Swiss-Prot record:
The keyword Transferase applies. This is DNA-directed RNA polymerase subunit beta. It comes from Burkholderia cenocepacia (strain HI2424). HAMAP family: RNApol_bact_RpoB (MF_01321). The lineage of its organism: Bacteria, Pseudomonadati, Pseudomonadota, Betaproteobacteria, Burkholderiales. One of its GO terms (cellular component) is DNA-directed RNA polymerase complex. InterPro entries: DNA-dir_RNA_pol_bsu_ext_1_sf, DNA-dir_RNA_pol_bsu_external_1, DNA-dir_RNA_pol_su2, DNA-dir_RNAP_su2_dom, DNA-dir_RNAP_su2_hyb_sf, RNA_pol_bsu_bac, RNA_pol_bsu_CS, RNA_pol_bsu_protrusion.
Length: 1368
């Protein structure tokens, strides 16, 4: 088994019973693949597929002018490289994007040419088409300096759907069937029955009309309509009565209205008897062709065709007319014998289309189309052209209607056609086929569709959503271009004069900046990033709305299995509408979710893996992943638990066709991180998966001792760690950079064989948490491709580490853990276990105002020197300054308007000079409740504004750092090149060289060391090939030098050019504060099983319950939090964590007494290879075993994968191994070793019962009391009501609401009440009066009129009631 460099350091012992058959796919694949398909940036222009940008261009171009003599054709497009890299965009508040340029061709035809079009001139040109945001390698976008994610949307697939109203519309509870054809873009077409069984259609949910109008509009006559939907009965008229052509099936079940006889007159069915199968058989045996029927049998039947008098050509009766006695009379007069009527019955052949034809008043195709026109455009006069144009545009024009590839495939499958391709617009037979199926459904044949089935819902990813926006922009451009194309020849225009890129840019900008699906990335920790990018939302444009979504849409559907996680979804109004992709789910070419299965042939499980969509899955019998198989892959059990079409059943192995890939395939990433998930109640598991995303990264991340084995995948795929591109040897490491000398076999000849990784240091995330990378390799380490070189936020040795492992005791403790409160030991705080660093960004801008520019300066009047002590000469705070709430960070003054001066002030100003009072202090201060250390300052200056000293110094420092960086890189590159060169030169024969090297001398190491490195290139080698190699290396070094000089120049240009700032802004200063947050009462904490609580007290370490060996517990939780919540997983985690730590202590004890390596090997083999997945410890060298053991001292990490975890028996074995009987006895353990005797820290007495004690991975959540605590004395007031604002962000007050007023009324506290409702709230004059009185030392309240009373009076007046206050 192959272990990566980091895995060898600390192997996670897995309890999985099944081998890994299919690796978890790259977790961000959906986002990255979708967007690269959209851009096709790396595909040569000629080989681009018609999707994404290419599809948008080809669908809109060529654009032809109205007169047809000029057209604009699209040739290809190209994307330039972005001007700023990702980091620079984030700092400057820019969008990380690339300019899109399209090559277009303007073709002008000769108007004079009489017959065939002749090209007069062709102009080709590249035209700028706006900026396209680019995706970062981790699947997000940087828009205006902030990282955003485009969430995928789950919407109803285009195609045709049949459903009924479940009997809710009509009071009788009758099922009303309906069908809907949904295109990708264009008008929706609905068909629906009403309670009277008449079939209507409507376009775009407008007024409904009889469906036969639509059928006539597509060119069918009433006869053709009836022929399409009915079978006919043939009658031959006799002098008395008639002969009916006998079709046996049509008579079964009917009641005979007369005696039915055979040819000989023998009665087979008597009158009023029901005709059964025996009667039919008798009639068939008698070879009956016709049955004589009386006259009244014909009455009331409906004619299928027009009946025309052969002689006169007169229409006696039309199709769909009822047969009456007068009609029969006319028929006999005209001598017509044969007539056809519609065969209908009440059971499975309803007369629906015939009844609809009756209510339809239109006569022919034109009338039908006019009726549709009037419905679509009421009030407009229907001219012939307008009517035709509108009807064709509705469903037949490619510009206005697009079923899309998916829609056509779904449509054809649903109406039972074999081919899945076809035209993208609607065809006449599509409409007919849909109506036929709908009528069949009403007749009781077939099934309606389930719209929540994942075969009927598809996912739209970033690429597709962006393409739709881009196309919308292009369509706007097309309209403008069409107008101007007419003048193209006369005014000699070029393509760039025709195309205005504004509409495209604004469409793209609006989508990425403010669409409902473009969301501010949740960056609290790596898991929240991954989950956000794997989210699938049913909301958004073209999707559902919260209010309209019913219970069914939100519910878990059997087709979610392996595609969408049944657990992870938000609590609250969005429940079930926002979902997460399952671990192995993947999108097919049509956008439907697929999940992998192992193929089973003749009850033998093969290694072939097939991805099945929800529709395909319904056809197969699929076994669970935990079905028992022998070593040959044969299914063993007599009956295997399996699923078919959403139903679970037990079947024999020979019927199994597929098998699940892994037990964890049904859940999402977050849910698969919960150990013992199978023992938790679903509601708590939901909370657990959601709360892991809120875990704040701790100062020192600690891997969970009990994990699930997916932690490594999670950390690596999130992009928070640094991975090696190529294998090699670590050449240099410091806190900010790792240099790797690449292996010879991976280095490219003639290129530099060095990879340099610059780490991210103390950067602010979107949620103000700290992102910081730390190297985990040492100089000289050998690493291979994909190994983790540095840990990021919340990762420990390349594994996700969201919290800390705490020693937990389940017991009540003086009521401090009542109702989910958490009791924590002071030691946890002292050791900084849950301390986190939060980085706050504070901004100040100097604007150009009407009264003059604002100024950033240290020279601020009426501020004491003490307050300016931390500012430099430019008025900006030093880096490293520790600041508190209210301290000045950046000094700024704003010009004040001239006011009328009193003579005294005039005199003072004349004496003391002008400046005294015409500016006010608007400095940036630290907000209330915040304190911290300044870790970074950035100054942005507008082009043409003089930079201050600080800004210049920041630029100089940055350039100096960059130069050092480049010099280091060059040194490393040169060192590497010269090393390779020396290896090549030693032993070669020279033709001459520096220091009088004789011809034919062999070069040795000593000679080379004596020479300056750059003189090596002057050596003339005898071997031509070697000489060429020498020249190549020289060129490559010079090329690299040149590249570095260019890079430095570019960096200098970027830094020294002015910054793009919003209009009216001259300077902007950003100050970054690092705030240290220690754990304190009021912080929210949680485990991974939805067991959340709030810290109630931090107890001195000496008062905590402790074990017999003196070790105190870290956390005390209430045991009553477990049974009612049914999340027993937490108890099992505690037991297994206890075993993990116990094993770690034993290994630590062996290392301390310097036990022999063999003893360590034996003990490790006992841990790793007794049960569960086997680890290959044989391949480890003694040094590696020693390093492994050192890393295991803090606990042997366990993996208990979801639905395939550790059993009770395995946990028992581990506990026995961790706590031999002597230790168990000393600690007072119970026989199963999962409970311990504890002693009360305050009295030293032993608790009378044993206590469940062990280790649980506990998280601190991003709901910190520091962010919520807030107090106000005076502050901002609302404009209208003059009451204080609400909320911490607005520095608002506490609302004293209606109920609180009742309480004061009940107490009779009248003065307090008066104060609350007037001066403390919205009595403006009273407020100032109180202040005056306090200054005078006169403590009296003069309460006036509350402003809200005036508002009330005004509102009453606005209703037209004259109300006035009687002031007497």
């Amino acid at each position: 088994m192959q272990y990566s460099f980091t895995e060898k350091k600390r192997i996670r012992k897995s309890f999985a019973k099944r081998p890994i058959v299919h690796q978890v796919p790259f977790l961000l694949a959906t986002q990255l693949e979708s967007f690269s398909t959209f851009l096709q940036a790396d595909v040569p222009a000629t080989q681009r597929k018609p999707e994404g940008l290419q599809a948008a261009f080809t669908s809109v171009f060529p654009i032809v002018s109205h007169n047809g003599f000029a057209r604009l054709e699209f040739v290809s497009y190209a994307l330039s490289s972005p001007a700023f890299n990702i980091k620079e965009c984030q700092q400057r508040g820019l969008t990380y994007c690339s300019a899109l340029r399209a090559k277009v061709r303007l073709v002008i035809l000769d108007k004079e040419s009489p017959n065939k079009p002749v090209v007069k001139e062709v102009k080709e040109q590249e035209v700028y088409m706006g900026e396209i945001p680019l995706m970062t390698p981790t699947g997000s976008f940087v828009i205006n300096g902030t990282e955003r994610v485009i969430v995928s949307q789950l919407h109803r697939s285009p195609g045709v759907f049949f459903e009924h109203d479940k009997g809710k519309t009509h009071s009788s509870g009758k099922l009303l069937f309906s069908a809907r054809i949904i295109p990708y873009r264009g008008s929706w077409l609905d068909f629906e029955f009403d309670p009277k069984d008449i079939l209507y259609f409507r376009v775009d949910r407008r007024r409904k009309m009889p469906v036969t109008i639509l059928l006539k509009a597509i060119g069918l006559t009433p006869e053709q309509i009836l022929a399409n939907f009915f079978v006919f009965d043939n009658f031959t008229l006799m002098d008395e009565g008639a002969q009916l052509e006998f079709v046996p099936e049509r008579l079964r079940g009917e009641v005979a209205r007369f005696d039915i006889t055979d040819r000989d007159g023998k009665v087979i069915v008597q009158k009023d008897k029901r005709i059964n199968a025996k009667h039919i058989r008798d009639l068939e045996a008698a070879k009956t062709k016709f049955i004589s029927v009386p006259e009244d049998y014909l009455l009331g039947r409906v004619l299928a065709k027009n009946v025309v008098d052969g002689d006169t050509g007169e229409v006696i009766a039309s199709a769909n007319d009822e047969v009456t006695e007068s009609v029969l009379e006319k028929l006999r007069e005209a001598g017509i014998k044969d007539i056809q009527t519609l065969y209908t019955n009440d059971l499975d052949q309803g007369p629906y289309i015939s009844s609809t034809l009756r209510v339809d008043e239109t006569t022919d195709k034109t009338a039908a189309r006019i009726a549709i026109y009037r419905m679509m455009r009421p009030g407009e006069p229907p001219t012939e052209e307008a009517v035709e144009a509108l009807f064709n545009r509705l469903f037949y024009s490619e510009e206005a209607y697009d079923l899309s590839k998916v829609g056509r495939m779904k449509f054809n499958r649903r109406v039972g056609r074999d081919e899945i391709v076809g035209p993208m617009t609607l065809q006449d037979d599509d409409i007919l086929a849909t109506i036929k199926i709908l009528v069949e459904l009403r007749n009781g044949k077939g099934e309606v569709d389930d719209i929540d089935h994942l075969g009927n819902r598809r996912v739209r990813c970033v690429g597709e959503l962006a393409e739709n926006q881009f196309r919308a922009g292009l369509v706007r451009v097309e309209r403008a271009v069409k107008e101007r194309l007419g003048q193209a020849e006369s005014e000699n225009l070029m393509p760039h004069d025709l195309i205005n890129s504004k509409p495209i840019s604004s469409a793209i900008r609006e989508f990425f900046g403010s669409s409902q699906l473009s969301q501010f990335m949740d960056q609290t920790n790596p898991l929240s990033e991954i989950t956000h990018k794997r989210r699938v939302s049913a909301l958004g444009p073209g999707g559902l709305t919260r209010e309209r979504a019913g219970f069914e849409v939100r519910d878990v559907h059997p087709t979610h299995y392996g595609r969408v996680c049944p657990i992870e979804t938000p609590e609250g109004p969005n429940i079930g509408l926002i979902n997460s992709l399952a671990l192995y789910a993947h999108l097919n070419e049509y956008g439907f979710l697929e999940t992998p299965y192992r193929k089973v042939v003749d009850s033998k499980v093969t290694d072939q893996i097939d991805y099945l969509s929800a529709i395909e899955e319904g056809r197969y019998m699929i076994a669970q992943a935990n079905a028992a198989i022998d070593e040959n892959g044969q299914l063993i059990d007599e009956l295997v638990s399996s699923r078919e079409a959403g139903e679970t059943m037990m079947v024999t192995p020979d019927r199994i066709q597929y098998m699940d890939v892994a037990p964890s395939q049904i859940v999402s990433v977050a849910a698969s991180l919960i150990p013992f998930l199978e023992h938790d109640d679903a509601n708590r598991a939901l909370m657990g998966s959601n709360m892991q995303r809120q875990a704040v990264p701790c100062l020192r991340p600690e891997k969970p001792v009990v994990g699930t084995g997916i932690e490594r995948t999670c950390a690596v795929d999130s992009g928070t760690t640094v991975q090696a591109f190529r294998g090699g040897v670590v050449d240099y490491v410091d806190a900010g950079r790792i240099v790797i000398r690449v292996n010879d076999d991976e280095a490219v000849a003639g290129e530099v064989g060095v990879d340099i990784y610059n780490l991210i240091k103390y950067t602010r995330s979107n949620q103000n948490t700290n992102i910081n990378q730390r190297p985990i390799v040492k100089m000289g380490d050998k690493v291979s491709r994909g190994d983790v070189l540095a840990d990021g936020a919340s990762t420990d040795l390349g594994e996700l580490a969201l919290g800390q492992n705490m020693l937990i005791a389940f017991m009540p403790w003086n009521g401090y853990n009542f109702e989910d409160s958490i009791l924590i030991s002071e030691k946890v705080v002292a050791d900084d276990r849950y301390t986190s660093i939060h980085i706050e960004e504070l901004n100040v801008v100097a604007r150009d105002t009407k009264l003059g520019p604002e100024e950033i300066t240290r020279d601020i009047s009426n501020l004491a020197e003490v307050q300016l002590g931390r500012l430099d000469e430019s008025g900006i705070v030093y880096i490293g300054a520790e600041v508190e709430a209210g301290d000045v960070l950046v000094g700024k003054v704003t010009p004040k308007g001239e006011t009328q001066l009193t003579p005294e002030e005039k005199l003072l100003r004349a004496i003391f000079g002008e400046k005294a009072s015409d500016v006010k202090d608007t400095s940036l201060r630290v907000p209330s409740g915040m304190s911290g250390t300044v870790i970074d300052v950035q100054v942005f200056t507008r082009e043409g504004i003089q930079r201050d000293k600080r800004a210049q110094q920041i630029i100089d420092d940055e350039l100096k750092r960059y130069r050092l960086d480049l010099n280091d890189q060059l040194r490393i590159v040169e060192g590497d090149a010269f090393q390779r060169l020396a290896r090549m030169l030693v032993g070669k024969v020279a033709n001459g060289g520096p220091k009088k090297l004789a011809k034919g001398t062999k070069i040795d190491q000593a000679y080379l060391e004596d020479l300056d490195h750059y003189h090596w290139f002057d050596i003339r080698l005898a071997d031509d090939e070697a000489a060429a190699q020498l020249e190549a290396i020289k060129n490559s070094i010079e090329e690299k030098r040149h590249q570095f000089d260019l890079a430095f120049e570019e960096k200098r240009k970027k830094l020294t050019q002015g910054d793009e700032l919003p209009p009216g802004v001259l300077k902007m200063v950003k100050v970054y504060l690092a705030v240290k947050r220690r754990l304190q009462p009021g912080d929210k904490m949680a485990g991974r099983h939805g067991n959340k609580g709030v810290v109630s007290k931090i107890v001195p370490i000496e008062d905590m319950p402790y074990m017999a060996d003196g070790r105190p517990a870290d956390v005390v939780l209430n045991p009553l939090g477990v049974p009612s919540r049914m999340n027993v997983g937490q108890v099992l985690e505690v037991h297994l964590g206890w075993a993990a730590k116990g094993l770690g202590w034993r290994i630590g004890e062996m290392l301390q007494r310097q036990a022999k390596i063999e003893e360590l090997r034996t003990f490790l083999t006992k841990i790793y290879n007794e049960s569960g997945r086997q680890e290959d410890l044989e391949s480890f060298t003694d040094d590696e075993i020693l390093e492994l053991a050192k890393n295991l001292r803090e606990g042997v990490p366990f993996a208990t994968p979801v639905f395939d975890g550790a059993t009770e028996e395995e946990m028992g074995k581990m506990l026995d191994l961790a706590f031999p009987d002597d230790i168990a006895e000393q600690l007072g353990m119970n026989p199963s070793k999962n409970q311990v005797r504890l002693y009360d820290g305050r009295t030293g007495e032993m608790f009378e019962r044993r206590v469940t004690l062990g280790y649980m991975h506990y998280l601190k959540l991003h709901h910190l009391v520091d962010d919520k605590m807030h107090a106000r004395s005076t502050g901002p007031y609302s404009l209208v009501t003059q009451q204080p604002l609400g909320g911490k962000a607005q520095f608002g007050g506490q609302r004293f609401g209606e109920m609180e007023v009742w309480a004061l009324e009940a107490y009779g506290a009248s003065y307090v009440l008066q104060e609350m409702l007037t001066v403390k709230s919205d009595d403006v004059t009273g407020r100032t009066k109180v202040y005056e009185n306090l200054v005078k030392g006169d403590h009296v309240i003069d309460a006036g009129m509350p402003e809200s009373f005036n508002v009330l009076v005004k509102e009453i007046r606005s209703l037209g009631i004259d109300i006035d206050l009687d002031r007497n």
